[in-house]
């Protein structure tokens, strides 16, 4: 059975951050990618995709988690792992960093 991963749009996430409703943002990109472009730091965790299957249990099951990568594909995969392992409050950032750039912050570098 395939698990459906809930999504949150960049605009929705920005509104929540601005309102003080801050989920844990989980960056699953490679470390060098964060040096190129990054989202505002609000309780971020960084677990690169290559390490995710071994390290996901570092994430607090009680927290709301929003996963992101460059375009949303790797973070969708990672979010699915969490959901399949009993995490409940998990969302994938639609479009990833590129979606954030398109909807929220056009000054963020594209890569």
Question: Locations of the language-model features?
Answer:
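Short, surface-exposed ligand- or partner-binding patches at beta-edge/loop junctions that are enriched
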Residues: 67-69
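Rhodanese-like catalytic fold shared by cysteine-dependent sulfurtransferases
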Residues: 1-24, 30-64, 73-111
